[in-house]
């Protein structure tokens, strides 16, 4: 297959063919040709050039969504904190505006809504827009019906609160669905959301790694245009260095991958804890939109906290959950050195642990120590080959370094594990 199809996808959606592999694009072309009963590439090429609808169909055959609810859970905890911090300054004049793109089949924007509702924020005080280049996934997202693969990790209390079991899987509650406005959109479109006010928070995670360098720079500038000057952007863990090159820097909340413009984010700045008095101020500002009493914050999902490898002595061990909570507390407080020390104590006391190596990988990732992070993720995967988050983080790091073949192998490995489990 000649590379004209790759060039077309590059021009339309910015896709760097090496990030997914030429075989993926060729398979999508063959799939579309078969669907149209065409046997000649030149004939299909003519059809593409004369049919915007067929271009969209090819894009949808190439873009295969891989997402789940509350991926990178610390991001959603941080979003809730930042939202409560920001609301009093709005004085009830408008709702918080949040953008998710690409939204894929809806797990991310719906997670945003559930996180804010569960944190105690009234549904009248925020609005969520969700964009994707694929009309097909937008249609699926609007239905709000999900299978088991969309629910990963051990903490699934949100599913009990916001979903009902149906024959097809799990149906999302109408209260959550109605808060998201879905639409098709292309980040390379110069007029994208031109008539919309900028957003307080923008989620664009694990997309930039699929672009070449010039397209990455172009897309970052589009995202900055969509973001308020004092807004916050949530990205994927492997994309931090790119944003740092474009006048953005992390706000200092570990494992959340949140950035602001440099002028808005003094080094080491962290969102202030929400005071007890902040919520009544917000409630008074918006008639009928009082904030309901906040339930205790849901526990953060952690990957397989009980999957420890016992030491050689084989002596029974006490439950390590409290010690892992201590690591999480230190990391969330920005005490990285102390969190690392706690991990080292765990390794010395209990022997190799996939969870501890995963935590060390995250801490290295956040610190920008990419090679060290890779080493720790690989150690976690040696002990637990299907550790979903270690696979996802390592794949993102490899893709960011240009090792797209290695990233694809890890993504395929993760998909095999999910299909086996679900």
Curated annotation (Swiss-Prot):
GO BP terms: chemotaxis; methylation
TPR repeat ranges, renumbered to this chain: 354-387
Ranges for domain CheR-type methyltransferase: 1-264
Keywords: Methyltransferase, S-adenosyl-L-methionine, TPR repeat, Transferase
Keyword Methyltransferase: yes
Gene3D superfamilies membership: Tetratricopeptide repeat domain (1.25.40.10), Vaccinia Virus protein VP39 (3.40.50.150)
Annotated stretches, region: Disordered: 289-316
Keyword Methyltransferase: yes
Top enzyme class: transferase
GO molecular function: protein methyltransferase activity; S-adenosylmethionine-dependent methyltransferase activity
InterPro entries: Bact_Chemotaxis_MeTrfase, CheR_C, CheR_MeTrfase, SAM-dependent_MTases_sf, TPR-like_helical_dom_sf, TPR_rpt
Classification via PANTHER family: CHEMOTAXIS PROTEIN METHYLTRANSFERASE
Subunit structure: Monomer.
Protein name (Swiss-Prot/TrEMBL): Probable biofilm formation methyltransferase WspC
Function: Involved in biofilm formation.
Single GO cellular component term: methyl accepting chemotaxis protein complex
Organism placement in taxonomy: Bacteria, Pseudomonadati, Pseudomonadota, Gammaproteobacteria, Pseudomonadales
EC number: 2.1.1.-
Binding site for S-adenosyl-L-methionine: 67, 71, 108, 132, 186-187, 205-206
């Amino acid at each position: 297959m000649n590379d004209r199809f790759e060039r077309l996808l590059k021009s339309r959606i910015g896709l760097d063919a090496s990030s997914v592999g030429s075989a993926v694009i060729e398979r999508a072309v063959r799939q579309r040709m078969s669907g149209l009963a065409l046997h000649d590439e030149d004939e299909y090429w003519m059809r593409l050039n004369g049919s915007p609808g067929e271009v969209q169909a090819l894009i949808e055959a190439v873009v295969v969504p891989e997402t789940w609810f509350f991926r990178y859970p610390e991001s959603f905890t941080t979003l809730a904190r930042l939202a409560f911090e920001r609301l009093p300054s709005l004085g009830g004049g408008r709702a918080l505006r949040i953008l998710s793109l690409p939204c894929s089949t809806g797990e991310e924007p719906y997670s945003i809504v559930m996180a804010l509702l569960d944190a105690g924020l009234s549904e009248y005080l925020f609005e969520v827009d969700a964009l994707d280049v694929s009309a097909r996934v937008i249609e699926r997202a609007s239905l709000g019906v999900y299978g088991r693969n969309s629910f990963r990790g051990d903490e699934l209390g949100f599913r009990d609160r916001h979903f009902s079991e149906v024959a097809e899987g799990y149906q999302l509650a109408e209260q959550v669905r109605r808060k998201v406005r879905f639409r098709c959109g292309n980040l390379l479109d110069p007029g994208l959301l031109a008539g919309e006010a900028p957003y307080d928070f923008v989620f664009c995670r694990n997309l930039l790694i699929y672009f070449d360098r010039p397209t990455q720079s172009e897309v970052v500038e589009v995202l900055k245009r969509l973001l308020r000057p004092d807004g916050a952007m949530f990205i994927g863990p492997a994309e931090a260095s790119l944003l740092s090159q474009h006048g953005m820097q992390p706000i200092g909340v570990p494992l959340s991958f949140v950035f602001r413009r440099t002028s808005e984010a003094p080094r080491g700045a962290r969102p202030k804890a929400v005071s007890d008095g902040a919520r009544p101020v917000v409630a008074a500002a918006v008639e009928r939109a009082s904030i309901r009493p906040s339930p205790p914050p849901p526990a953060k999902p952690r990957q397989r906290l009980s999957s420890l490898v016992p030491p050689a002595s084989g002596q029974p061990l006490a439950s390590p959950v409290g010690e892992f909570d201590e690591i999480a507390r230190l990391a969330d407080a920005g005490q990285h050195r102390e969190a690392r020390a706690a991990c080292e104590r765990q390794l010395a006391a209990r022997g190799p642990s996939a969870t501890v190596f995963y935590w060390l990988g995250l801490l290295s990732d956040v610190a920008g120590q990419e090679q060290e992070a890779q080493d720790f993720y690989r150690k976690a995967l040696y002990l637990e080959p299907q550790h979903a988050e270690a696979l996802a983080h390592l794949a993102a790091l490899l893709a960011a370094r240009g090792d797209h073949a290695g990233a694809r192998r890890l993504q395929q490995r993760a998909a095999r594990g999910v299909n086996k489990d679900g």
